[in-house]
From Swiss-Prot:
Cellular component per GO, a single term: extracellular region
Chief location category: secreted
Main function: FMRFamides and FMRFamide-like peptides are neuropeptides.
Biological processes per GO annotation: neuropeptide signaling pathway
UniProt entry keywords in alphabetical sequence: Amidation, Neuropeptide, Secreted
UniProt-recorded name of the protein: Extended FMRFamide-2
Keyword Transcription: no
Lineage: Eukaryota, Metazoa, Ecdysozoa, Arthropoda, Hexapoda
Positions bearing Arginine amide: 8
Family recorded in the similarity comment: Belongs to the FARP (FMRF amide related peptide) family.
Keyword Secreted on entry: yes
Protein location: Secreted
Length: 8
């Protein structure tokens, strides 16, 4: 998973 994008 992409945590940087989930943080949006």
């Amino acid at each position: 998973a992409d945590y940087l994008q989930l943080a949006r």
